[in-house]
Curated annotation (Swiss-Prot):
UniProt name for this protein: Ribonucleoside-diphosphate reductase subunit beta
Family: Belongs to the ribonucleoside diphosphate reductase small chain family.
Annotated organism of origin: Buchnera aphidicola subsp. Baizongia pistaciae (strain Bp)
Subunit structure and binding partners: Tetramer of two alpha and two beta subunits.
Annotated catalytic residues: 123
Catalytic activity: a 2'-deoxyribonucleoside 5'-diphosphate + [thioredoxin]-disulfide + H2O = a ribonucleoside 5'-diphosphate + [thioredoxin]-dithiol
Amino acid sequence: MTYTTFSKNKNNQLYEPMFFGQSVNISRYDQQKYEIFEKLIEKQLSFFWRPEEVDLSRDYIDFQNLPQHEKHIFVSNLKYQTLLDSIQGRSPNIALLPIVSLPELETWIETWSFSETIHSRSYTHIIRNIINTPSLIFDDIIDNKNIANRAKDIAKYYDDLIELTSYWHLFGEGKHTINGKKIKIDLHELKKKLYLCLISVNALEAIRFYVSFACSFAFAEREKMEGNAKIIRLIARDEALHLTSTQHILNILHNDKNNEGMSDISKECYEECYHLFIRVSDQEKIWAKYLFQNGSMLGLNQEILSQYIEYITNIRMKAIGLPSPFKILSNPIPWINSWLISDNVQVAPQEISVSSYLIGQINSEINDSDFEKFKL
């Protein structure tokens, strides 16, 4: 099936599946097959924020006074989050847009990816405000084995889908020899690649960020690195929306009544999906061990974080129809909910700047040239 950015075939988009139907031609929103994506778009747009709105001048002082093992925890999490959102800032567009068939879903994917680029910019904003040589941090991301090992697992499902989709668009279904390699291209296998990719993305949004989130909020609970925590809180709000979107996509695919042609695929991939979540959970526990290898921080340690990972893994798997693999039933760090559920938080403005408002709109930098027009 040859891909075109604008199909001249007139069609009724209400009868198209989410994926692998006719590519979107007219981006129209007066009629929608799945209104949830329009609601997600509107919500994400209402969330719009910029990292520069948050003043990090106090965080610089806080960071200098952290013990070395806490600096390791803080910086390592920023490195990992930078990697995750570097992938998420581009991959949904590259992997999903060429096969999407609904305008509301197409626009949601673009809106989602754009918000991820704001997250990437945020980590740069944080790093260059607390560290004199930011390149030392960014240059280590690729070289750090603890980060790189997880990157392979994250990118694999995207890459597999992108590769097979490219072949499908160029050569169509059938058996082909490409660069001396025999490849079978069929829609069933392509749908399977898509489904596993969506499960992988869901696991990423559902679990992979939350060790870093917990650490950032634990610092702020001690009134340390509070500017960073305000930014991470905004990121966490976005990620919760992205998680909701992937859960909706998957549950729509699961429902036979929607005629998406994917319910058999979900059953076929059931075991692999279950073990994918377990693997992600195990990787995050290993990451927690790496973070706390030189010491714990007040209110948080490797054991507590591992329990929290199991707790949220149970919830996330249940949300998409998978059984809960762990026995833990209660949240071992309930205080984190006040950071993740923004409506729970009321902050006195005189005590600390409020992250629910646009802040830092005034440029606080003053140079000698700013006083040239002043007369005494």
